Amino acid sequence: MGNPVEGVEYEDAHEEAERWVRGDRQADYYEQFLERSLENPLAAHGDGPLNKILKPEDMPWELSPQGLLKHMLNEDMAEELDYPGMGADMYQQVIPPGSHSGKHRHRGEEIVIVLEGEGYDHHWDAQLTVTGEQDREEPEWEFDDEPSKFEWEAGDAVYVPVNTIHQHHNTSEEDPARFISIQARAFTNLGFGYEDLEQFEAAPEYESDE
């Protein structure tokens, strides 16, 4: 079987719509997830909470050290809006033409889904050093001296490993780049996500706004 959406026309489509449909590879992951869920006695299969939609008006903007963010979901928002989405932290980020995000690291892994634009990431990967000292309260991490470069475009998904220092760059001088950042809430609840967040460099827009 070829591409299941081949032949579908996208009139006036955005760049992301033209790119994400590429590829013929298929899988049955969802059916496997469903089968395992039905066999799980602890899984809930009821109607669940009623408030399941967040509107753009519910999602606040923030000009942060990491850049311009539009928060889609986090623990504080879930409590304020009586929203059941407690499993993930998500925000959209917009990087102006020719600019870049701040540079930071957090203990939890992250997935970045590119919606618009093109650019690259710099990643300084982290290695956990085992010293044998049983009384050490915090693990010791060593970071690469030079970053690895990963180019991306609309439709791509970028994986940011645990504790990796990273920074996003928009290579277009005309168009903004926009992506969604997702991090599992479990890391945060265990103290391994945004509870362990370190900023090394601020986005230019944040610095100019100070």
Language model: regions and residue ranges:
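A short, N-terminal "cap"/entry segment at the start of jelly-roll beta-barrel domains
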Residues: 1-86, 194-199, 206-210
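Short acidic-glycine-tyrosine-enriched beta hairpin
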Residues: 113, 126-162
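Short beta-strand His + acidic residue motifs that chelate non-heme Fe in jelly-roll/DSBH
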Residues: 101-104, 121-122, 149-151, 160, ...
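A structural connector/turn signal
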Residues: 90, 100, 109, 147, ...
